[in-house]
A protein has these predicted regions:
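Bacterial N-terminal signal peptides that target proteins for export
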Residues: 2-16
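Non-globular targeting/processing and membrane-anchoring segments
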Residues: 17-53, 176-381
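A short beta-strand-turn-helix
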Residues: 47-70, 93-96
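Sec-exported extracytoplasmic/periplasmic mature domains
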Residues: 50-53, 80, 84, 94-98, ...
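Short active-site neighborhood of thiol/selenol oxidoreductases, capturing the structured segment around
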Residues: 60-83, 89, 102-104
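Structural microenvironment flanking redox-active thiols in thiol-disulfide oxidoreductases
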Residues: 83-126, 135-141, 310, 377
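Thiol/disulfide oxidoreductase modules built on the thioredoxin-like
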Residues: 125-130, 135-178, 347-352
Length: 381
């Protein structure tokens, strides 16, 4: 998320301190019933399972973390919703790690290339994540918690019991208050720490329009597996659905509707990705869409190929500097982004919410589009 974050704050209300002290008593009550294991509030938190690798720490276990307050954050590094939560996670780590909070980022990958340890290590460095990260490549820990979303946060108390959970973005003040409360219950002195009073980022009301054409564009996937479902059908060409892993030549029909992708030229419909299926010289093959948003992001992976550039146009022209996302550069009057690793590229950042035509094209046959995501915030991806 771009921009400088400032966190106006004040001390936690005395009423919350009373609640925290009451929790201390509750947690130390004799003859307590041992809760069942699971991801629901009141359950004993499951042990980490099936972890392929640990980043930023040695192997951790929930048993070893008894006495600490643990925040389990399920994430994946190309997920825009996860990326939007990172400034808050980093702030909590900086403020509360010395007080007994342990954040564990459980990385459960959406795409195969996100399973590669070097990719996760690089993303942790790029985002400035210093807390422990567990690679949950087979979703074993995800399943143990019966988790169902990225991002998802589970707060576990000093006795290993799940006390709070939240799916998706937002509720940052509520989450921090719960962290504060559980640390007090664990015996930490955090009364000198100022809790943020900043409201959640403002989601623009235009994005909730009842008009489908104006409503925030849904997440759009390129791969056959996500397309070939009742909630999918992201590709607006019937031939695409005749079978996976096929190369077809597509013709753009020209009349574009919000929430769909349109193709021109030769494309391969892989299970996870839509890949350009030939080398070209004049950017004649493209992916087009009509979108409604303030920002557009594209998950692109070069595979094992050489780096390449993707040309971007909006409403039939290059992006202007005030419309360009952080990954856009300008070359000889063109707006492009250079793909040298598999990640989410921030392509469009408009000054105001609106509906526009977008086109992405590349001469490389390594150009593989996995997903588009869209934002409707005053700033950020």
């Amino acid at each position: 998320m771009s921009g400088t974050f400032r966190f106006p704050a004040l001390r936690l209300a005395p009423a919350l301190l009373v609640v925290a002290l009451a929790l201390v008593a509750a947690c130390t009550a004799p003859n307590a019933i041992v809760p069942k294991t699971g991801g629901n509030v009141g359950d004993q938190a499951p042990e980490f399972q099936g972890i392929a690798n640990w980043i930023n720490s040695e192997r951790l276990t929930m048993e070893e973390l008894r006495g600490k307050v643990v925040l389990i954050d399920f994430w994946t590094y190309t997920c825009v919703n996860c990326i939007r939560t990172m400034p808050y996670l980093k702030r909590w780590h900086d403020l509360y790690a010395d007080k007994g909070l342990v954040i564990v980022g459980v990385h459960s990958p959406e795409f195969e290339f996100e399973k590669l340890t070097p990719n996760v290590v690089d993303s942790a460095k790029t985002f400035g994540l210093a807390y422990p990260i567990a690679q949950d490549n087979d979703f074993a820990t995800w399943k143990a918690y019966s988790n169902r979303a990225w991002p998802a946060k589970y707060l576990v108390d000093k006795d290993g019991v799940v006390r709070y959970k939240h799916f998706g973005e937002g509720s940052y003040r509520e989450t921090e208050n719960k962290i504060w409360e559980l640390l007090i219950a664990a015996g930490a002195d955090v009364r000198d720490i100022l809790v943020s009073t900043v409201p959640d980022p403002k989601f623009l009301p235009e994005a909730r329009s009842r008009d489908r054409a104006l409503r925030l564009t849904r997440e759009l996937y390129g791969g056959y597996e996500r397309n070939n479902t009742r909630s999918g059908l992201y590709i607006a060409h019937g031939d695409y659905y005749a079978g996976a892993e096929r190369v077809l030549e597509y013709t753009d029909p020209g009349d574009h509707q919000n929430h769909s992708l349109y193709l021109q030229g030769n494309w391969f419909n892989g299970y996870e990705e839509l890949r350009h299926a030939r080398k070209t010289e004049s950017f004649e093959d493209y992916i087009a869409l009509r979108f409604s948003a303030t920002s557009v992001n594209a998950v692109v992976n070069p595979g094992e190929g050489q780096p390449f550039e993707v040309q971007v146009t909006i409403d039939g022209r290059p992006l202007r500097p005030d419309e360009a996302g952080p990954d856009i550069s300008f070359e000889q009057g063109r707006s492009v982004f250079k793909v040298d690793e598999g990640r989410m590229y921030e392509v469009v950042a408009l000054p105001a919410y609106g509906s526009h035509e977008l086109r992405l094209s590349s001469n490389s046959d390594d150009f593989a589009l996995f997903a588009f995501t869209f934002g409707a915030y005053e700033e950020g991806p």
